[in-house]
Amino acid sequence: MSNFTAKVPLSERMADVLISKDRWKDDEEGYLKVKYGLEIILINVMKFALVYGIALVTGLLLQTVTVHLSYLWLRRYSFGLHATKTLNCTLISLLMFVLAPFVFQNIPSNNWIVLGTFGFILLNMFLFAPADTESLPLIGEEHRKTLKRKAMIGTLILTGIALLIPFAEMKTLIMVGSLFQVISINPLTYKLLKRRYRNYEKYE
């Protein structure tokens, strides 16, 4: 029994505890959907707690928030790759949002570097955004055009923020978070990781 339990992910065991299967005995499909949704929430909460807990302990909270928000701001409309395994996702999150802020926190940037970097980012948004995944194909040409337009507008807004912010080191962190998102939508990344690109073509 203990060997079986050890092989069950913690998030699944927690979901089993939080959801009473007896209440869903007449709706197995509904139970599985709710359980899966709860597992996703628990995984994200635990990952968030781990990343930000380490950032807090190491004195990197502001740096982590800056990189993470910049990344999420662009990802909202440009989408991009997701790790296929929870462990990989957690490790990548630690590298991106803890290790990278630690490495780049004291590196200043001027506005010429900001303009050059965000020019590159804007070009990538124009060429490659939005990028979908096997589990989340972005169906509909007009929908994709709208997302691309919003991703480019979001890039311009973030460029303005990076230019106006008075802290040279924070400019660097904003660019780091933004470049992480560029990596996640670039077709070369898909190719290197052997992931399918333009998944919507399978449905159109």
Swiss-Prot record:
InterPro entries in the cross-refs: AgrB
Record's keyword terms, sorted: Cell membrane, Hydrolase, Membrane, Protease, Quorum sensing, Transmembrane, Transmembrane helix
The organism's taxonomic lineage, starting at the top: Bacteria, Bacillati, Bacillota, Bacilli, Bacillales
Gene Ontology CC: one annotated term: plasma membrane
GO molecular function ontology, one term from the record: peptidase activity
SMART domains the record matches: AgrB
Membrane topology, record value: Multi-pass membrane protein
Protein name according to UniProt: Putative AgrB-like protein
Superkingdom of origin organism: Bacteria
Cell location: Cell membrane
Family: Belongs to the AgrB family.
Function comment: May be involved in the proteolytic processing of a quorum sensing system signal molecule precursor.
Membrane-spanning intervals of the chain: 52-74, 87-107, 111-131, 151-168, 173-190
First-listed, main subcellular location of the protein, grouped into a coarse class: membrane
Keyword Transmembrane: yes
EC class name: hydrolase
Protein EC: 3.4.-.-
GO biological process: proteolysis; quorum sensing
Record has Acetylation as a keyword: no
A Pfam cross-reference name: AgrB
Organism name: Listeria monocytogenes serovar 1/2a (strain ATCC BAA-679 / EGD-e)
